[in-house]
């Protein structure tokens, strides 16, 4: 197919209604019940269990590196300005942080199960921290 040069067309500024060449549409219309196709939905809890298995298999970090690094620098700024961090130091902090959070959520889940619930709540986290001796 040969390329052709496009020339500028003068615009009138007003919208002109388009002319319909044929009264019938080019594709056959479907009945109403075929048009609205239901999207597939998994049963409640299926996707959550799949995510649990996926994250338990993996060993990579779950918190994004740059936001965590910014948070560390922001907290360190309160104690001393112009601090520098090695990449390995921030990575070690992130490993320790994620290990702590995973352990806390495991204990929190046990507290929720003890209360005959499956949903964790703030009071479960508070109880887990209190039992650990982190909070008076």
Curated annotation (Swiss-Prot):
Residues recorded as bearing N6-acetyllysine in the entry: 5, 10, 15, 19, 24, 37, 57
Keyword Cell wall biogenesis/degradation: no
Any GO molecular function: DNA binding
Subcellular location per the Swiss-Prot or TrEMBL entry: Nucleus; Chromosome
Region (Disordered): 1-30
Entry-annotated residues carrying Phosphoserine: 11
SUPFAM superfamilies associated with the record: Histone-fold (SSF47113)
InterPro entries per the UniProt record, alphabetical: Histone-fold, Histone_H2A/H2B/H3, Histone_H3/CENP-A
N6-methyllysine modified-residue sites: 5, 10, 19, 24, 37, 80
PROSITE patterns listed in its UniProt record: HISTONE_H3_2
Post-translation changes: Acetylation is generally linked to gene activation. Different methylation states of H3K4 mark distinct developmental phases. H3K4me2 is associated with euchromatic regions. H3K4me3 is a mark of active chromatin. set1 is responsible for all mono-, di- and tri-methylation of H3K4. H3K4me facilitates subsequent acetylation of H3 and H4. Methylation at H3K9 is linked to gene repression.
Entry similarity comment: Belongs to the histone H3 family.
Subunit structure: The nucleosome is a histone octamer containing two molecules each of H2A, H2B, H3 and H4 assembled in one H3-H4 heterotetramer and two H2A-H2B heterodimers. The octamer wraps approximately 147 bp of DNA.
Name the record gives this protein: Histone H3.3 type c
